[in-house]
Amino acid sequence: IFAFEPSTSNLRVLSRNISINNFSNKIIINQTPLFDKDFGFQKLNEEGFNEGGALNAFSVDYGYDGKKFNPKNSYNIYGTSINFLLSNNILEIPDYIKIDVDGIEDLILKGGEKYLKHEKIKSILIELNESFVDQTSNSINILKKNNFELLYKKHSKEFDTSEKYSSIYNYVFKKKN
């Protein structure tokens, strides 16, 4: 398992959980954020300094909802793409992919499009905010174009009554036979 976590606030929580659960030999942390370019320095904008917090944005000035994002913390960090990591044999092609990055899911998919058709990839779980229509549509179109079909989408029941998060779902796609 390769876990990509560029946020310094979340890295501490992730590494602690890996250690507590004795997964040090099973999970490798990569602090490099993914996006649609092979490599480059971009801004990582963070909502705050909360450990385990979300609502961060890499390489863009919008948040999970597509609206302008005003970060409380911002710094430059090196990012790369799935295409670059796989083309240079830094990583092996995965069987399963989970993407939950608060607004740039489509950019990460675009940065991995060279390999998405590979038969080794069986399934992709991706969190999408349906109120961010362009990002949701782009993500679904990239996956369909690369031979994935939607199995289901769901979210926590608590999201049903949340004005802020009611349009956020985990979509599960599987590779067509």
Go through each PLM region and give its residues.
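Phosphate/nucleotide-binding beta-alpha loop and adjacent structural elements of enzyme active sites
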Residues: 1-177
